[in-house]
Amino acid sequence: MDNEKGLLIVLSGPSGVGKGTVRKEIFDDPTTSYKYSVSMTTRNMREGEVDGVDYFFKTKEEFEALIQEDQFIEYAEYVGNYYGTPVQYVKDTMAAGHDVFLEIEVEGAKQVRKKFPDALFIFLAPPSLDHLKERLVGRGTESDEKIQSRVNEARKEVEMMNLYDYVVVNDEVHLAKERIQSIVEAEHLKRERVEAIYRKMLLEAKK
């Protein structure tokens, strides 16, 4: 089974739903074998974040230059900031047989779906929009106006749930993590993926 190509795992959901917290919980687990593809952004670094670990932080000018060079799988402008996924790392890592984990915005996930239709798309949903607003207020990093803008955007994003393969409600971080890991494990056992590997093995055996 060494010939299996890596799976592209795409986790997205509304701002404030806890994508980063769930992703950290997954990668703090020593049994996790996924490779994390660090996204790039022009937003300000938050307290506790590390450049090159949580995001690659760039200026708007630097980001736009990379767009012109076609260096992104996807990118989107969200609440005045750019977010994007550098392309080469993802392709190389999957080709080497490793699963690649993306934590991106909903608009970006739509672009990835077009380029990687076989990827695994997971929507991380809040228990409710009120709960989401409480999380955003609790951050203490944005104005009331910006928080309301994010909540309004979240309403639209929840309506786009049908673009995803699975929905995981982030009611408890450790439960969300376990649900995502179970989904990925099941995806590797899908008949289409396993059948393709065995067909390749049978062809090689005939040589």
Curated annotation (Swiss-Prot):
ATP binds at G13, P14, S15, G16, V17, G18, K19, G20. This is Guanylate kinase. Pfam families: Guanylate_kin. Essential for recycling GMP and indirectly, cGMP. InterPro entries: GK/Ca_channel_bsu, Guanylate_kin-like_dom, Guanylate_kinase, Guanylate_kinase_CS, P-loop_NTPase. Keywords: ATP-binding, Cytoplasm, Kinase, Nucleotide-binding, Transferase. GO terms for cellular component: cytosol. Its EC number is 2.7.4.8. Coiled coil: none annotated. Residues 6-185 form the Guanylate kinase-like domain. Belongs to the guanylate kinase family. PANTHER family: GUANYLATE KINASE (PTHR23117:SF13), GUANYLATE KINASE-RELATED (PTHR23117). It is found in: Cytoplasm. One of its GO terms (molecular function) is guanylate kinase activity. It catalyses: GMP + ATP = GDP + ADP.
